Amino acid sequence: MSKDDEGSLVRSLFNLLSGTFFSRLTGMLREIVMATYFGADPLVASFWLAFRTIFFLRKLLGGPILGLAFIPHFEFLRAQNISRAAFFFRSFSKFFCYSAIVFTLVIELGLGVWCSCVTGSLFDTLLLTIILLPSGIFLMMYTVNSTLLHCEKKFLSVGLAPSVVNVLWIGTVFLARNYNPRNRIFGLAIVLVIGFILEWAVTLPGVIKFLGRSTETPKERDSIRALIAPLSLGLLSMGIFQLNLLCDMWLARYINEVGPLYLMYSVRIQQLPVHLFGLGVFTVLLPAISRCVQDNEHQQGYDLLRFSLKLTVAVMLVMTMGLLLLALPGVRVLYEHGVFPTTAVHAIVEVLRGYSGSIIPMALAPLVSALFYARRNYKVPMLVGIAAAVANIVLNVIGCLVFKHVSVLAYATSLASWGQLVILWYCAGKSLPTYKGLMWRTFRESGKTVFTTVLAAFITVGINVFTNTTYIVFIHPLTTPIKPLTSLLDQCGVFFAESALFLAILFGLAKVLKAEDLMNLTSFQYWKGHQSILRN
């Protein structure tokens, strides 16, 4: 294995982001095509509710938690003997494959009985869930294979794999656009199952190549029992977290029959910066930090984490302010086409602005958790995550009953996310004195970045007011547009013009005020991992 430093970290991150960006781009295209041809009605909302339920059931079996438990233990075994590590992966893979199959069969039986007792939109939701549920087996195996490929620094194929599903999704929606609404929704569900099988198949070559390097049977065989305790905590945490997300969807349906659609489309946009960059940094950082801990290179681990925190804060600040400023023109570009109504666009924007406050803590929390996972201490982040999820559910229920607006669910999520980050870092400082104060140091050093970004946003809005173009960023503008923004060309023109204005002001101010973290983001060498740029 090559030595882990800032340069290798960024090169791995670059590879991961390249694949993930393409997958997210195709994912965004599928959202546009869905909105344009399928619109916003209760049947489409039932599809999204079923789709979210599938991921809830899949993550009950582990989901991303598998990587958090597997990677540090795998790196520990590989440092001693690659044959032990390979044997352990085979056992790990078989266990979760068989578990996923049994789990799917049991749930399918239960849903079949329930489906025979209901009618209406609930029947549609359950039937769509029954159709989609087998894809959870292949989603699980894709996740298992991805954990191994991350350790092998094969990030590009893992990031690209979901785009296979998205391309099939887009093609199916386009070809079925003139079919009966009910038939096309159920047909899409069947095609997606095939897509998830292909997504899993993309990861097979890398896994086979690794296993081919270790053909001998190790003298010492390691059981996955070593991961049972941390996985149990992880599954409990993930189960409550996913219950929280599912609760959001059902509460949104309680408030508005199309509420799940508003929530799903806004979450997809909010997750773009978090998953594309925040979790991308974490995915690359965890194996690197784990190796630093195994080799007792604590100073190098400190430097890597500090670098990752500063980089993530700078990017997420820009993303947060950009989301607040560009929510309306961005949602118009994505969704306000074909049969998708303007009222749904405004509802998505309101929810999206509520989620904007969660971008920074959601991106930073996994980086802090890496400190615990690297030492195979899973209890603290899991318990903190459980507490945050429970608090979020309570806030959601209270907000739903008091305000009866879908956007309140997003604001509750943002509030709970900040609470989780604060508690998580407090625990990290108590148990890991070496890293104590690093988070606060990062925020202090990012003060100029915060000031510059906020100032750029205010100047941008000021220019909108001065030029009578507040209709671009406000749902209720101070002035009405000269002509309605109904064509894609007009919507794209407005969005890119507003984006260019904000970014020009932002990076112009960064240069004047010498905000180095922002200036570094415009450096190509910075992203390619050149040491001289990184040290500056």
UniProtKB/Swiss-Prot annotation:
InterPro entries: Membrane_Transporter-Flippase, MurJ. GO terms for biological process: cell wall organization; peptidoglycan biosynthetic process; regulation of cell shape. One of its GO terms (cellular component) is plasma membrane. The keyword Membrane applies. Keywords: Cell inner membrane, Cell membrane, Cell shape, Cell wall biogenesis/degradation, Membrane, Peptidoglycan synthesis, Transmembrane, Transmembrane helix, Transport. It is found in: Cell inner membrane. Its main location: membrane. It is a multi-pass membrane protein. Belongs to the MurJ/MviN family. Involved in peptidoglycan biosynthesis. Transports lipid-linked peptidoglycan precursors from the inner to the outer leaflet of the cytoplasmic membrane. PANTHER family: MULTIDRUG RESISTANCE PROTEIN YPNP-RELATED (PTHR43549:SF3). This is Probable lipid II flippase MurJ. The lineage of its organism: Bacteria, Pseudomonadati, Chlamydiota, Chlamydiia, Chlamydiales.
